[in-house]
Amino acid sequence: METIRFALATALAAALTLAGCTAAGSSSTAATSGTTKASAGKPAFPPGLAHVTAYSINTDNPVLTSVVSGAISDYGPAEAVSPGSTGVSAHGSELELKLTHGTFRLNIAGIDTKFSAGTSHEPIYLRTCSTYVSVSDAVPIVPGSGTGAYQGIADTFAMTLTLNEVHNSPCTTSLSILRQVVVLSGAGKITKR
């Protein structure tokens, strides 16, 4: 159960990286409205503030749902993968966002390490047999990982990874969960190199 949850958290962390901020803990800035023309049927990729959310509900599967808004408007699955690998991995240190206009990867190793430490003593609330863990870290885009409309995408995002769940009774994490929500979210300025 912890291995699966770790993979899910890792996948979420990567997805949130796309939403990047310039520094963890920095204040949010309202995105300005703007229009950039797309060329040859491909979406425009202007530099600017992007918001990323990746989430999973009631599953520890390392495949999440992601939505990106702001400088990028796209959506698709986000999969935990190992560096250089193309297959889903329960222990992947990268999160590959497979969006409708291209893909890119987030390095979620740092936020995943913090998340694993935060969940190491589950359930956090023994009396109610529930857990709430929230950690934040900088999540960089893996250099050279962009494809399609995201070829050349770069920068680092401030992300938060949150787990909120209720465990079965008797209270143990080795049993299945009753309800679980895992959310990786953040914002940041993206650039193209």
Regions found by a protein language model. Name each.
Residues T22-A24:
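Bacterial signal peptide processing site
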Residues M1-L8:
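Bacterial N-terminal signal peptides that target proteins for export
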Residues L18-G20:
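C-terminal motif of bacterial Sec signal peptides marking the signal peptidase cleavage site
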Residues G34-R193:
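Beta-strand-enriched cores of mature, soluble protein domains
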